[in-house]
C-alpha cells in the first residue's frame, strides 16, 4: 500500500492540473460567443411617441405644420435618452426641460472640477 503522503501529493497534483486545464477552457463554444457579440450590436427597439389627438388648437396649426418647430435632444451617456417636442410642447415644457438639463450638466461640471 502506498504511503499516505504519496496519495496526498498525487491528489494535490491532480487538483492543480485540473485547475490549470479549466482556467484555459471556455464553457461557451466560439460560435455562441460570436452570436452574442452580434446580438449586442443590434440596436434596441425605439419607443414610438404617442399620438396627440385633440392636443393642438386649430389656431396653433396642425401637427404637420408644427413639425418645423420641433425640438429634439439626445444624450449618449451610459444609456441613450431622447426627447422630442413639437412646437406647442416646447413652449409648454421647454423652460422646465431647460432647468432640468442645466441642473444635470451643472452637477457633472462640479463633480469633474472636484475630481481634478
Curated annotation (Swiss-Prot):
Residues with lipid group (O-decanoyl serine): 26
Swiss-Prot/TrEMBL keywords: Amidation, Hormone, Lipoprotein, Secreted, Signal
Name by which UniProt lists this protein: Appetite-regulating hormone
Subcellular location: Secreted
MF (Gene Ontology): ghrelin receptor binding; growth hormone-releasing hormone activity; hormone activity; protein tyrosine kinase activator activity
InterPro entries, per database record: Motilin_assoc, Motilin_ghrelin, Preproghrelin
Covalent lipidation (O-octanoyl serine), chain numbering: 26
A cellular component annotation (GO) from this entry: extracellular space
Region Disordered: start-end pairs: 30-62
Record PTM Leucine amide, positions in chain: 97
Cystine crosslinks: none
Entry PTM: O-octanoylated by GOAT/MBOAT4. O-octanoylation is essential for ghrelin activity. Amidation of Leu-97 is essential for obestatin activity.
Any one of the GO BP annotations: gastric acid secretion
Family: Belongs to the motilin family.
Signal peptide region: 1-23
Pfam families (alphabetical): Motilin_assoc, Motilin_ghrelin
Residues carrying lipid (O-hexanoyl serine): 26
Maturation-removed propeptide residues: 51-74, 98-116
Protein's UniProt keywords contain Ion transport: no
Biased composition (Basic and acidic residues): 31-42
Principal localisation: secreted
Lineage start: Eukaryota, Metazoa, Chordata, Craniata, Vertebrata
Amino acid at each position: 500500500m502506498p504511503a499516505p503522503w504519496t496519495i496526498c501529493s498525487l491528489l494535490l497534483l491532480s487538483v492543480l492540473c485540473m485547475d490549470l486545464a479549466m482556467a484555459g477552457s471556455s464553457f461557451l463554444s466560439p460560435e455562441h460567443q460570436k452570436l452574442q457579440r452580434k446580438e449586442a450590436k443590434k440596436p434596441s427597439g425605439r419607443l414610438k411617441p404617442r399620438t396627440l389627438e385633440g392636443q393642438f388648437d386649430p389656431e396653433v396649426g396642425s401637427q404637420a405644420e408644427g413639425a418645423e418647430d420641433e425640438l429634439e435632444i439626445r444624450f449618449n451617456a451610459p444609456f441613450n435618452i431622447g426627447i422630442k417636442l413639437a412646437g406647442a410642447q416646447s413652449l409648454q415644457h421647454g423652460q422646465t426641460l431647460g432647468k432640468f438639463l442645466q441642473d444635470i450638466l451643472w452637477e457633472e461640471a462640479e463633480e469633474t472640477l472636484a475630481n481634478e
